[in-house]
């Protein structure tokens, strides 16, 4: 018997002081049966960090040809490709060839650092790639905010991201491992 995705709803007020972006988004996230709350909330964090009217969640773990989020223009050109985890170098290179900007959000603490030590040198010359690491204490704290129906506020200022519900606020400071040139 196949397990179905669990649907989560998030009403998210996003205030990005760095980009002067203020908007409310009603989001629907389908959590794949193998996806953890931590990973799902990191998808939500990535959305908040790059929010726009054209940024969308994809089939994610259910598809090998799509990232976790992407932003396309009206012609279907991929402007932004956002991936979570530790993708293979071949997949990253393919994404960089298809999209104007590729952003990788690493997490999982020490395993992410080991992945970057093994993969980073091979990616150093890719000009449209940004690699960010989310410290494990931040991603685990974000996971605690996961509920089937969420009312969240996201504030971004000076590269720091605060995600809050009515009771708890989590500050996330992404570590920049590689920045788009």
Over which residues does each language-model region extend?
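Feature captures the catalytic cores and cofactor-binding loops of soluble hydro-lyases/lyases
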Residues: 87-144
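Short polybasic amphipathic segments
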Residues: 10-12, 69, 160-164
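Conserved catalytic cores of phosphodiester-cleaving nucleases, focusing on short active-site segments
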Residues: 69-71, 76-95
């Amino acid at each position: 018997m196949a397990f179905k995705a669990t649907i989560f709803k998030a009403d998210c007020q996003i205030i990005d002081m760095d980009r002067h972006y203020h908007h409310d988004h009603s989001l629907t996230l389908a959590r794949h049966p193998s996806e953890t709350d931590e990973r799902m909330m990191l998808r939500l964090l990535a959305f908040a960090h790059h929010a726009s009217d054209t940024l969308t969640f994809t089939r994610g773990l259910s598809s090998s040809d799509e990232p976790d989020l992407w932003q396309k223009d009206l012609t279907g050109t991929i402007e932004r490709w956002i991936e979570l985890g530790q993708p293979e170098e071949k997949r990253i290179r393919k994404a960089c060839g298809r999209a104007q900007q590729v952003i990788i959000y690493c997490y999982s603490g020490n395993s992410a650092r080991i992945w970057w030590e093994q993969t980073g040198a091979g990616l150093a010359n890719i000009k449209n790639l940004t690699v960010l690491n989310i410290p494990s204490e931040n991603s685990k704290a974000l996971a605690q905010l996961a509920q089937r129906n969420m009312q969240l506020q996201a504030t971004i200022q000076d590269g720091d991201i605060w995600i809050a519900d009515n009771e708890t606020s989590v500050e996330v400071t992404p570590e920049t491992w590689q920045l788009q040139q």
